[in-house]
Amino acid sequence: MKKVNIGVAGLGFGKEFAAIYCDHPLVDKVAICTRNPETLNKVGEELGIPEELRFTNYDDMISHEELDAIHIVTPIKEHYPQSIKALRAGKHTACTVPMATSLDELREIVKTSREVGKIYTMMETSLYTREYLYVKRLKENGELGKIQYLKGDHMQNMSLEGWGDYWQGFPPFWYGTHVLSPILDLAGTTAKSVRCLGSGRVNKERAEHYGCPYAVETATFRLRNSDIVAEAHRCLFERVF
């Protein structure tokens, strides 16, 4: 099988993926990109990535002729424009979640992927946790019986040290794939319709950041070609004040 060459944009969480690609038997060359030269060279030395595959400019990396694919692991506001750029540069593109924060942006990514004939992958991680794989195996082995209803919760605390300021007040279901993806995978289908309600209140500073006052959001989904109704709850702050 032909080996692929991959560029990783963002070396926070992205450093973990760069290391994985360096060890993957089907990956040949790995390029890395971050605006911080010190971080770039530190990670490059740790992983043995040659200097010619280290970039501080994203446009320069996606223009590299030898790269087959780009993996975007940057702050959320960069996901949409960087995904579009990579696709239009003729690269298969993977991006950490969320892929974008508006319906128009989501549709544009899908449209561009189809137009240029390159694969776009939304890199949702919750489908690969030990807990989810255990439940999935139970279903595949017939140990769950007929599923009548699905419900999921995903609670995080973005007020802890280490999370960027842009997370403060982030609307919970703008970041809903962690809770929804396992539900849809177990059901083996996609969502047909959704009704979402907000509950509780975050403090004024957080509410004003994105115009979302809710501490918790709850969504009820009708699933395509299924008699199952699914419910999902999302919260990004353990303490809202």
Describe these PLM feature segments.
Residues A100-W163:
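A contiguous active-site-proximal alpha/beta segment in oxidoreductase catalytic domains
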Residues I49-T112:
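Beta-loop-alpha module in the N-terminal Rossmann-like domain of NAD(P)-dependent dehydrogenases
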Residues A31, A69, Y149:
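Short, Asp-centered acidic motifs that coordinate Mg2+ and/or phosphate
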Residues E161-F241:
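Rossmann-like dinucleotide-binding domain that binds NAD(P)(H)
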Residues V27, E52, K91, K118-Y120, ...:
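Short, well-ordered coil/turn segments that N-cap beta-strands
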Residues I72, T93-T96, Y120-E124, E231-A232:
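Short catalytic-loop micro-motif centered on adjacent basic/acidic residues
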Residues H24, H64-E65, T129:
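Acidic-histidine catalytic/liganding microenvironments
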Residues M1-G48:
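N-terminal Rossmann-like dinucleotide-binding module
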